[in-house]
Every structure is written in C-alpha cells, then in structure tokens.
Amino acid sequence: AGEYADELANLGVRVSNLEKKVGNISWSGNARMRWVQGYDGTEAKDKYDGRIKITAHADVNDSTYVQGRLRSDMNFKDSKDANTYMEELIVHHQFGDKVGVTLGRQDLTLGQTGTYYDDEFDGIIATFGSDKLALDLGYGRFKSWDLKAADGSNTEAFLGRLYGSTGRLSYDAEYINMAYNQGNVWGLGLTANITDKIDVFGDFYKNTDADNDPQVWTAGLGFGHTNWKKPGTFRVSAQYIDAEKGSVFGASTYNVSPIDEAISKTDVDYWLAQ
C-alpha cells in the first residue's frame, strides 16, 4: 500500500486505513525428502525420510516479535506415525538499531560453514552491532549436545561470538565455555570472495578442556550462491574436513558425513562435495 500511496490517495483511499486491516502474522515453510547413508560401524543402516517445517511470525509491536516453528518428521521405511513437535519458539525485542535480545529456543549456526554446530540453542542471546560487525553474548544449552552434570542435569554454556563482513571478507571468532569443565572451545572462521561467484572458506575449533586439546578444521572452495527467492540460482562446493577425537559434540550441518564419529570414537578426515 505504501508504494502506491499517492495513487490510492487520489482515489480517496487512506493508506493508514488499509494498513490497519493487514494482519500481523505471516506464515512460511518448506518440505523435503531425503536418503541418508549410515555411518555407525557394521550396524549402519541407510535412512529414507521426509520432513516439513511451518514457521509463524507475529509482530507484537514495532520492536517486538514472537516466532515459532512446527516440525513433522516421518520415516518412509516403517509404518509409524509422523513425529510432530515445536522446533523453535522465541521472543525477540529490539532496543534501538544496534541492540537486540532473543529469548527461547532459537537457530544457531557457528562459523562460516556450520561444521561445528548448526542446530537449536535454548537460552538467551543478546546482539550488539550491525551487519558489518556484531557481538553475540549468550547463555543456555546447546540442544543437541548430550552433556550432563554429575547429578544428571543438563549442562549450560556461555557463548561469545564476534562476526561481520567487510568488502569481500566474512569472518567470525567464537568462544564457548561449558559448565563442569566439559568444554572450553575457541573458534575462528573466514570466507573470502575471490570473484562474485568463487569463494574460499574455512573454520577452525579447538577444545582446550579435553585431553590433548583436540581440534577440528575445514577448508574448501565454492562456486555460486543459492537464493531461494530466485529460481535458477545454485551453489556447488568441495571441502576437506579433519576432526580429532573429542573435538566435536555433534549437530554438524552435514547430515551425510562421518564427523560424528569424532565425538568419542576416533579421528576422522575426509572430502565432502555438495
């Protein structure tokens, strides 16, 4: 309505009246079907499953919104009912242009690639800054990390992230401190755009609380950029991943890879193309 305010005014229609009639809730979603190769030793079994996600976003006022995401999973190899649950539920409040706070179960991707973590975070994250340089300070639980205290309770963690972009570079530095000395992790990531379509990228993380300070790193080369709003766009990439035993806790962005074997079983190193 705002784009055609003058034309509507000439017709005697008040834009403000139209805006009052527009709902403050928006919906979006996606669905997928996939086949996944198993990597759990001799008992590894391939999976063929489906998933649908529906997100609802509601503006409370100009500074606050509530957002929730429902997820339903099903396995095409059995006859069980789909498992439907609330995957994300957050409240976000913006204090001016450069300070915001998000409370609840929220998406969290670490590094340039998500190799170290790409899943939900249960807690609070305060964000300071802008797209060029921002600081996140958070406290809560990494949902997919199976970390327990001596009494069996879940382990909280402090998260600090400094990230941004300038020119052809995108960068981040991260620190994670877990309760009961279960992890003290430092990480760095960098993406350099060589041209408008070609980039090199990498991440590095080290856990200084584990024996021998195990580390995980990845480096790769990518071509193209996927934009879901633009049909025909695509991206292909290849990267090398090296993860020492005890360097990761799970929930990598790569579902079809053996990186979870490095949680407690063995070192892994491999090439990944996508």
Q: What do the predicted segments below correspond to?
A:
Residues N75-E88, H93-G187, G246-S264:
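Surface-exposed coil loops of outer-membrane beta-barrel proteins
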